[in-house]
């Protein structure tokens, strides 16, 4: 061996010891010498002795170049089945040599697709994967960090010492290392050394499980071991158009729905208690429920109440409870606060078994600056823009994804596919879409950067959203993709091929603001604001709208829904019932936040749980009962949902009686031609002979009334229904002479075969 080669060996060994070597395979593992002989070099920091075990022989390994680089010569290629007998700190153990496994995990096609932003299953390559290499079981680690000087795997496999497991740099900024015989459950991070000498410890961006907060390590976890039982559900979902279905969503935060006592721990299958995850410092002794416990308690509740879907506020891993989950650090992992990934899979499986769809909030608009997360990931602005005028939300203290970078876009698009593929979710609600679409969102003049055309539109984000929705529906045609978009950006729910963003539903923020502004008014003043409750119909067919009363409306001093209402307690409950009933009979799919279904009094607090004791009080139980029966009515009457996005589905009877604050309209469906008459009185003044025009003569059964005694109302109504009179009004030749209860909404169904006597006898029975 020449002196030059010896010098190179010494320098390379020193670079390894100093964590500055980006190609350890060039030095370590089996290497063929010029003589034709082979040498095995092993990197074993702080070892006292190392022996090479090959074909049953033990060869003592020497350290001619560095105290931690052990080598031994052999006459043939030893492959990767040799072992190392290591003595360190007086303790001996055997292991396979990680640098004997040279197979590239990311193939050429993988790298090509990833580089162009089109590898929709990149999570099958990136991250930590239990797999076999050359017949040996272990974990393959794979990371994208193109600007890093070196990357090491650290964790409880090496006492968090970055010198032990340096990774090999591949083409395209990919780093790989196979650690043989490593099992699931190991905690790990990546130690990234930058070109300017800094060192960062980062959680795995593609990690499939992470530690419970406040700890931040990733955990080696499998992907494909869960046995699903929902094939029939998935097949049925992907054959249907979800817009033609009744959709009534229960939005919720898993950690603040209901708590358990820390003195009553969750018991594992082997009989051992699971360490409780504290709910909040302000609530000592309370713990979060686990995914299995939530499956046992939440799913029956949602089914009993008649909701079609659960919408979960972000369950991707996040370090801070106070972010409500919207500041994500673990994009490819359900939060460990409530249990394991497989336990969340089982939760979704149980939902599907009970006929309940699962929607999750997805947050591709920004990410936090936590040191273990994506921020300044490899010593450069890898995932975010470098210029804070387009790369930072200063008001939120978060960073904005660089959608122009193919690999970043790929990270997000593949993440979308991942949640549908791996966790069988049925839909997403994309948070804060407006913040993505506008470069000047929440920015004063001079603090934002115009696009390439000089405008404020974020064209890169537009292309990203179009790609994400196109890929989603290509893979999962029956999915829901819901936009929380608070502006008048056009064509949000138009297909991408028509130039739209490609969502199939959009939250109707205008309807929400108009309704809450109206219902917060003293009823006497409502006559001057009739437009608030009628204006939405003028634009409701411009998009596929979902009506949402969400978590954002019951926090930060806004009061919960019940306490937004004017008047005494009776009027507050009546107003709440009337608003919810108007929501259910108005065109558009439905979403309400947890607690609204029974008249929660206190504002939502992420560190608390709902006021379930209120159900012991009849007014709250009445609201609860009404929401359940509203959902039942909604499902059984196609006129309330089948033509939500067709103008045929809605017809005003009278929207101009602002003096009485009364509105009346019809909901219709085109398949069977059925229709309903809806009449609402939004003042405390009842009316005993109120005329409403109807298109056909006959008997009109009162099938729903928010003023029913069972809901907490005054029990005024129409004794089960009314026959029509030949009294023309509202452009119709027939009309109903109705009793309108105070602060109420009623639904009538025409049935020429029924009479008042038949309905009355049925009620008595």
Swiss-Prot record:
SS bond partners: none
Q: Check the record and name the InterPro entries matching this protein.
A: A-amylase/branching_C, Branching_enzy, GlgB, GlgB_N, GlgB_N_E_set_prok, Glyco_hydro_13_cat_dom, Glyco_hydro_13_N, Glyco_hydro_b
Which is a Gene Ontology cellular component entry for this protein? cytosol
Q: One GO BP annotation here?
A: glycogen biosynthetic process
Give the positions the UniProt entry annotates as the active site.
Answer: 431, 484
| UniProt pathway annotation | Glycan biosynthesis; glycogen biosynthesis
Q: What keywords sit in the KW lines?
A: Carbohydrate metabolism, Glycogen biosynthesis, Glycogen metabolism, Glycosyltransferase, Transferase
Q: What is its EC number?
A: 2.4.1.18
One Pfam family this chain carries?
GlgB_N
Q: Which reaction does it catalyse?
A: Transfers a segment of a (1->4)-alpha-D-glucan chain to a primary hydroxy group in a similar glucan chain
Q: Which GO terms describe its molecular function?
A: 1,4-alpha-glucan branching enzyme activity; cation binding; hydrolase activity, hydrolyzing O-glycosyl compounds
Domain of life (superkingdom): Bacteria
Q: Tell me its family.
A: Belongs to the glycosyl hydrolase 13 family. GlgB subfamily.
Summary of subunit composition and partner proteins: Monomer.
**Function in brief:** Catalyzes the formation of the alpha-1,6-glucosidic linkages in glycogen by scission of a 1,4-alpha-linked oligosaccharide from growing alpha-1,4-glucan chains and the subsequent attachment of the oligosaccharide to the alpha-1,6 position.
PANTHER family per UniProt: 1,4-ALPHA-GLUCAN-BRANCHING ENZYME
> What's the protein here called?
1,4-alpha-glucan branching enzyme GlgB
Q: Which organism is it from?
A: Synechococcus sp. (strain CC9311)
